[in-house]
UniProtKB/Swiss-Prot annotation:
GN (gene name): gcvP
EC top class, as a word: oxidoreductase
Residues spanning the membrane: none
Positions of post-translational N6-(pyridoxal phosphate)lysine modification: 684
Name this protein carries in UniProt: Glycine dehydrogenase (decarboxylating)
Function: The glycine cleavage system catalyzes the degradation of glycine. The P protein binds the alpha-amino group of glycine through its pyridoxal phosphate cofactor; CO(2) is released and the remaining methylamine moiety is then transferred to the lipoamide cofactor of the H protein.
Keywords, sorted A to Z: Oxidoreductase, Pyridoxal phosphate
GO cellular component terms given for this protein: cytosol; glycine cleavage complex
EC id: 1.4.4.2
Subunit structure: The glycine cleavage system is composed of four proteins: P, T, L and H.
Amino acid sequence: MQERSFFSRHIGLRSDETQKMLDVLGLDCIDTLVSQAIPHSIHLGRVLNLPKAVSEGQALEELSKIMGRNHVHKSFIGQGYHGTCVPPVILRNLFENPAWYTAYTPYQAEISQGRLELLFYFQTLISELTGLPVAAASLLDEATALAEANAVAVRFAREKKTKISLQSLLHPQILSVVQTRAETQGISISENSEICSNTAAIVLSWPDTKGFFNDYSEVIKEAKAKGALVIVVADPLALTLMEPPAQWGADIVVGSMQRYGVPMGFGGPHAGYLAVSDALIRLIPGRIVGQSVDTKGRVGFRLALQTREQHIRRDKATSNICTAQALLANMATAYAVWHGPQGLQEIAQRIHSLTCRFMGGLEAAGIPCEGESFFDCVSVVVKGKAQEIARQAKAGGRLVRILDDDRVAVNFDELSTEEDACTLAQLFGAQLVDQVSPRLWGKGRDAAFLSQPFFHVVHSETDMMRFLRRLSDKDLALDRAMIPLGSCTMKLNAAAELMPVSWPTVANIHPFVPKEDAAGYQEMINQLNAWLCEITGFAQVSFQPNSGAQGEYAGLLAIRRYYQSRGENQRTLCLVPASAHGTNPASAHMAGMEVVVVKCLSDGDVDIDDLKMKAQLHKDRLAALMITYPSTHGVYEENIKDICSLIHENGGQVYFDGANLNALVGLTRPADIGADVCHMNLHKTFAIPHGGGGPGVGPIGVAEHLKPFLPGHAQNGTTHAVSAAPYGSASILVITWMYIRMMGAKGLKYATQTAILNANYIAERLSQAYSILYRGKHGRVAHECIVDTRVLKEQYGVSVDDIAKRLIDYGFHAPTMSFPVPGTLMIEPTESEPKAEIDRFCDALLSIAEEAKKVGAGVWPKDDNPLVNAPHTLVDTLDDAWVHPYSRQEAAFPNHHLDPTNKYWPPVSRIDNVAGDRVLICSCPPLGNTS
């Protein structure tokens, strides 16, 4: 029997359903719809030149052969990446569980309590390890975490101090990212320089890149005396045994949680962490989970202090970070819960003991080693034999790090065995000794840590399985229902696409292995580069950015460096439409550009007259226009080519925000439209799951003239890296490879057409009760539409928040709220949803409009109705004292489409956001501490 094509399973509509939707739109075929929606001037006019689509089985077999060309040696390289054991119970029940990986960022708190709770535990874990009171809910990686910390220090000094003094040796990849960030932010990075009045912070590595702990007591004392902050880059596993950095003066601590049960994956994705003192709370980048209460006083969690973030403060935000690494942070937290504090310390002690015995053996054999104090790494002096030692180690299936011609570093980890240590010692002509004293610096931890009950509840796999299930049951992800978030593209993340991520040949490769050992990765990445170049029309793609916002930053950096190479250093002005995503102005600011806002017209289009005036006014300084297409208003602007030409005529470059690329693939190409650079959200258009707030991948495609200015990497001797690993979150690139390989050109084009059809069908159905705010020339929308709900507020007092919360009772995640227009809903159905689910969603919104009318008619009071009281929990619905003027049935089962056997019950009622920010609680206090 012939296997069905993958794209017929990826796309939610059956052929008869497609025709029914077209009938509602009064159209005979989908091509007619596309021709009405998209300007004729940008139509591609040909089929993409991609390999013919193959089945799931064929794609898996092909990719397996490619990745089989990687050589999985045991890594002793270290340098920020370590072998770790992913507990199977976490691999199966979290990492490979769609209830966890298909969820969106938890902006809608009431339907996100499970992952918010686990992220709250993540923050608690980081606070306990570092001794600092507040931690972010993950950053993109260790290198960007330090770059963000440096920016925090400069902001804390109100930009009167701009020097960061590195007082110890950082890993080369971290140093490179820090230098890149500093270059455009007016920050001076100096190594081992004296602390002066202009020093905002000193940076200490704990341990440093050679594995050493140093006595920093004097330099910390000097920094404190001169008003400089102390930033520490710390290994979180070493911190289980050592005195928390806050106790010896740290104001900020950053690092990577990779070795807490997250595979190396050729560089990512991994969760960076950042913790700060109380004085720095409102300067912290990224998301923070805070504790609050719901309407009944029950504890609930929410994203706190959101006014710091880019979607609100735009170019004045603390950072451009949007997508972080929530899934990996949750994995690391689950790892800590699984092992508990004692288990973590046992792992750390075993690693340290093995390292000490290895070094003791070398010292006994007269082989010089550097450093007095260390945790897991030994730097061995070999006098010109480093290459030969590394070659011999590799011949035995082990990889060590070459520091220079005269020194190698051997880094032990959770997977290292006594046999490994013995064999490596023999390479140096030494034997492992039986027992030696610990070589950690300082007095160690003087008190219990992780005493909170949730780090002690798991004693068996049954406990862990149920712990993760209990949390995931609180959430609404794609495994339960459609998530119609505009500008987020919550499409299917197919099982076959995700399977390879767990393969040893994908997961267990260190990012700095010899090139020949990653031949499979290179081939896969080269193929993906070629495919994405064909899809977008660009000359080259960099996969280093590991989020869309970081892609924006990398693209703008390429533009800036291009102009610098031409001696046009003055070109630092960026035009940004008023309707742009918040990351656009935030990224421009981070890239050292001045942001000038361009007006939009009442129909949602860019105001060409205003654009022309500002482009000509600033033509000598113009660097770029950042533009989203289709626009954030959900329409294809007719004059997009003219807009691009106008910018080029005035000496600028066109930065194309690829957030809405799902409306373009196979139909047109950004480069053909006139773009010079574009980021692609692989976690939107190209099927990588959102993970509840990351991981994401935001590669950038560039035109030929910008190729020399793509991000480099210290490992290759090049500069301007934007993330720690050469290919960013490399291991999840296989998801996009699988997606494109199985869809083929025909499937990709049909997916885009179906996404446009679904959005137009929704717009048509909802226009019975709501105004569709923006439409194109022929009355069509793109792949998303903006529904104006302000009339319900004006006539009946029902807010967009009330509608969003009421949708939970109907079993839905709310669409994007109040962007780009306050009081509206932006709806994006994607191509993956079946017609029945789309109809169920439309019915829900139409029913809510009828409920609002009842409020307006006085059937229900404005202060006591199903909308203002939404969402309704099971406990509240069963309450003996039901005092509302509407029935329990109307509260919990508001229309006949709700299946009582498949009902989603929110665990909390509406969360009090004001209370959560007024009394900020970002971690759980230790047992016995109620302060």
